[in-house]
Amino acid sequence: LHDALPISKSFAMGMDIPLIAVNHMQAHILAHFIDKGKQLPSFPFLCLTVSGGHTQIVKIDSPSKMQVIGTTLDDAAGEAFDKSAKILGFSYPGGPLIDKYAKGGNIHAFTFGKPKIKDLDFSFSGLKTSILYTIQAGMKENPNFIAENKEDLCASIQHSIVTILIDKLTKAIK
């Protein structure tokens, strides 16, 4: 954004076209309703936005009135997927590979630490550390630990991340 904004302004000025500022996260939320045939949802509603850099719960009162009620404190959910995948030796982006291998795994094979944040904010750094320590301990005992447990590890990682998201969203609904 830091580099793109001046370039965008210069381009718009040079082409004599308007430059319309759009909030990146609002665009994520409202992009689903761009289709002219789609009806806007009833307001208010909650939106869970998950990406590599952001994890947010947003209360939407109208297309122009939004309130973030839970946000990323350290690492976002997408980053937790990608960093976990890196620990497993997968290429970037790792989230799709974790999802692929998780389909054949047992979600209860491994348990990882859960964040102890009481409000609606998200923290995935502790979970990432727990995943790292579990894998390091397994590799110390068995050099083939990742290969032999890849599906179960992926299923357990995915389950842990998604459970955190669902728990926070459920709390926000109440």
Outline where the language-model segments fall.
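Active-site nucleophile and cofactor-binding loops and adjacent substrate-binding regions
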Residues: 1, 19-27, 48-50, 73-76
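A contiguous, well-structured pocket-lining segment that forms one wall/lid of small-molecule binding clefts
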Residues: 100-174
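Glycine-rich phosphate-binding loop plus the immediately following alpha-helix
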Residues: 23-26, 62-106, 128-138
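Short beta-strand scaffold segments in enzyme catalytic cores
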Residues: 47-49, 55-59
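Short, small-residue-biased leader/transition segments that mark boundaries at the very start
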Residues: 3-5
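Conserved phosphate-binding catalytic cores of ATP/NTP-utilizing and phosphoryl-transfer enzymes
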Residues: 17, 22-45
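A cross-family phosphate/adenosyl-ligand binding-site feature
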Residues: 19, 47, 94, 109, ...
